[in-house]
């Protein structure tokens, strides 16, 4: 699933806090200056600037700087409590700050089609990612980026280039950035669902942060994507010293988007193979005295299907949609054998609340039989399933208030089912 890495020395909490204060100062300064610049532009162009309550961000367009840099900056606060199950206690709080840059080389007066991209995060607080005996994180932002608590982490640093109908991405890429615009999956845990099963369904062969390349070629209504990347998580890596030293992962995906029954629909199949060695779950050193060995080669094949059930009368292409992702894997050394994630999500269909959105989903993960059999002498290790529902109240485009409820039947067989509730506040600066 997710692979932990060691945090490099030299990155201190003081540096992280200093960076966050610098970002806050930048937001404050631009928030004060941008309205004056916008007013001047409105006077010259004749169009009034959007009001505080109708613009997309709290601090406005920063005098054109935001558009030039393709900059997004948001802060998210979380509260979550266990209502029933192991670990019933008082609720906990945490926070996270995200800065994304998607610079266009053409806007810088350079070549056309190029892009410079970065995703920098900082997270802190005491809200744990794992609760109630669940193997999958119930609070994704409390775990990812890996080992990134109280640290400033550049989870994405990559270059992109368009060649007609093709797009190439090279560098360090946060895998959670890839489904960012999906109406059901994705969201980093700062938007839509909290549980990692919905945010980024674990495949066993895709680390949270990859180092490598992604090539996408579009030939409507199809698109073909090829990925080549190092099998290890690269969250704390900023060099190419050991790139592909432990093997290589290759992924191919074919997607089709169009209409079915007059409404927006899509389907995709993705196959990923890794040459890296992984733990042989049939030999993991249990019981004491036995030897842990490794096994080479792992795969995952997934199918995604989406269909718009009810289209929004206000926003074409949005509405109430059905989304499903099913996958099979080798089960050894991949800790996942099968998985199913699906549900519905609604956008722009709530009467009187055009910006509100919601989602309800179910997940089931069937883990490796070899792993479960090996653990059996010392404890019960079951499959894991759960249900999650959320509703996002959006009074203005830059403010999202989300209520969340989860039920999880954890993989740890010694733990009963757990109920969790959460509140989330996200402000786009």
What is each model feature region?
Residues 2-6, 30-32, 36-82, 88, ...:
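N-terminal periplasmic/intermembrane-space "pro-region" immediately following the signal or transit peptide
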Residues 130-158, 165-253, 372, 379-380:
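Surface-exposed coil loops of outer-membrane beta-barrel proteins
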Residues 253-256, 270-299, 306, 311-312, ...:
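Outer membrane beta-barrel transmembrane domains
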Residues 417-429:
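Outer-membrane beta-barrel "beta-signal"
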Residues 81-95, 110-157, 242, 411:
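Surface-exposed loop and membrane-interface regions of Gram-negative outer-membrane beta-barrel proteins
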Residues 71-79, 116-122, 168-172, 224-230, ...:
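Transmembrane beta-barrel strands of outer-membrane/channel proteins
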Residues 164-165, 196-312, 316-330, 346:
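Signature for the C-terminal beta-barrel architecture of outer-membrane proteins
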Residues 53-71, 102-116, 165, 221, ...:
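Short loop/turn motifs that connect adjacent beta-strands in outer-membrane beta-barrel proteins
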């Amino acid at each position: 699933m997710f692979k932990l890495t060691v945090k490099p020395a030299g990155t201190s909490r003081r540096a992280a806090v200093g960076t966050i204060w610098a970002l806050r100062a930048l937001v404050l300064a631009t928030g004060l200056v941008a309205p004056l610049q916008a007013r001047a532009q409105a006077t010259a162009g004749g169009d009034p600037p959007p009001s505080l309550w109708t613009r997309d961000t709290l601090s406005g367009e920063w005098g054109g700087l935001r558009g030039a840099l393709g900059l997004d900056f948001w802060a998210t606060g979380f509260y979550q409590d266990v209502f029933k199950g192991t670990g019933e206690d008082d609720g906990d709080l945490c926070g996270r700050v995200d800065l994304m840059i998607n610079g266009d080389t053409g806007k810088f007066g350079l070549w056309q089609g190029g892009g410079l991209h970065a995703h920098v995060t900082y997270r802190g607080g005491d809200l744990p990612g794992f609760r109630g005996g669940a193997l999958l994180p119930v609070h994704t932002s409390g775990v990812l980026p890996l080992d990134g608590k109280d640290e400033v982490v550049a989870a994405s640093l990559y270059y992109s280039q368009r060649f007609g109908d093709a797009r190439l991405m090279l560098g360090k890429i946060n895998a959670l950035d890839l489904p960012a615009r999906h109406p059901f999956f994705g969201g980093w845990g700062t938007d839509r669902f909290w549980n990692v099963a919905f945010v980024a369904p674990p495949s066993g062969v895709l680390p949270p942060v990859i180092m490598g390349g992604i090539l996408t070629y579009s030939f409507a209504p199809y698109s073909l994507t090829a990925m080549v990347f190092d099998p290890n998580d690269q969250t704390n890596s900023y060099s190419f010293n050991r790139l592909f030293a432990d093997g290589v992962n290759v992924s191919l995906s074919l997607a089709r988007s169009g209409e079915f029954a007059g409404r927006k629909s899509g389907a995709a199949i993705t196959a990923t193979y890794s040459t890296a060695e992984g733990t042989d779950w049939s030999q993991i050193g249990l019981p004491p005295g036995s030897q842990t060995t490794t096994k080479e080669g792992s795969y995952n094949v997934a199918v995604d299907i989406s269909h718009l059930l009810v289209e929004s009368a206000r926003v074409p292409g949005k509405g109430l949609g059905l989304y499903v992702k099913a996958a099979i894997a080798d089960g050894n050394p991949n800790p996942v054998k099968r998985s199913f994630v699906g549900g519905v999500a609604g956008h722009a269909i709530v009467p009187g609340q055009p910006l509100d959105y919601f989602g309800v989903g179910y997940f089931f993960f069937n883990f490796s039989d070899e792993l479960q059999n090996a653990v059996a002498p010392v404890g019960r290790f079951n499959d894991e399933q759960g249900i999650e529902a959320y509703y996002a109240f959006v009074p203005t485009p830059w403010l999202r208030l989300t209520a969340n409820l989860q039920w999880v039947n954890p993989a740890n067989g010694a733990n009963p089912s757990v109920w969790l509730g959460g509140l989330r506040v996200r402000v786009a600066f």
